[in-house]
Amino acid sequence: MKLTSLLLLLCATAPSAWGWSNHTVGSYLALQDLPALRDAPQVEVEPLERFLTEQYPAVLALLEQQESFAREHFAQYPPRPDNLKLPAVPSDNLRHDFLTALRINPEIYLAMVIQPLPGKDLPEREHLQANQVMVEQTLSPWNRQRFIVVAEHEKVAPLAVLASAADEPDYGHDINLFSDNPGEVGALYGFGPQPFGDARFQYSSQAPFHMGFFHESAVVYAAAGFLERSWPDWRAYQYMGLARLAFASGHPYWGYRFLGWGLHHIQDLTQPYHAKPLPGVDLASLLLLEGKAIAGFAEDKQASIERVATRHMEVEKYQSTWLRRVLRTGQPHPMLDAYADVAQDKSYPPYSVDYLREVVSAEAVNDSAAFDEAIGQWLETAPVSSDFSSGNQLQREDFDHPALNQQ
């Protein structure tokens, strides 16, 4: 069916598999006034290996319970190959065994760092470069993160750990996990071929773990079954379970860090372009677009593809640039207040394993048409992003401290 080609192109031309350009900034703003975080004691930094060593039997049991549940509960879930199970006796490479049991990219750095809010950096502290924190495929000219090194046994604020960790899954967790991706693990993990994403860009291999099209019609799924092969809700389930275990067993640093990883996937599905392939276009219009293309009039189809790709990219660029600049001025702003607004929180149901599918993505889909229209109206009058010169080269950003500008 030709509708398949249109939907495949829409997913392939998504400009990025990131839901938001920097999850840390929004997480700070949304969570900083919550008493459970604001009043929580500082936590001690510890390497992953310490948590795994001290809690190995519990981690092994949890991962087996999660695998059994996933096979029964998550649609289109590809079972984990049995040889990836954590060994009964810990090996000499705990980290590798743990990451492969989770079916995460084993090449991620898991650097012990925190991100500060823009304008609140600590220039006297040691910083890491982006390529020391993020795998190569996720590096981008748009990377603006500042990474402050934290040492083992150092005490840090829970909010800093949680907000910083909320950005981490974009540092390579889900890169090259499919059988047709470069590298070795794709042939081992059992996910099969990459269902959607643009193969020209290696970072797009993370898309099926960061996007979820859960509310399409039966006609769309019949024409494009690949849309059902995405697992952001499963990833969040894994990480939330690990967070509960870490908190319960006296490892709050990893509790907050795993919690941030899970929060990342929830935030991804608040992005309408991650929950709806073509916002604002109903099924009849979608079929009309494809019918006209079949008849030789493909201009409207191509325009729709370019429109959604442009709006997706521009809203993420704007969100990142705007937040960075507003925070560096230190001035109040209604949009900043909106991040911390909890007035509607009690109207939402309790969190559950299906929350991403039934609540988060459903709300994003319901709002997607109006959101897309608003972005379109803004782009009609918006100036070219000042992050770019007329030669389409990213301009250097100066930070508040000379020491940072030398990095």
Identify the meaning behind each predicted range.
Residues 11-16:
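N-terminal signal peptide c-region/cleavage motif recognized by signal peptidases
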Residues 17-245, 275-407:
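N-terminal, motif-rich segments that launch catalysis or mediate targeting to/interaction with membranes
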Residues 246-280:
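Active-site beta-strand/loop microenvironment that shapes enzyme catalytic pockets
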Residues 1-9:
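Sec-dependent signal peptide recognition
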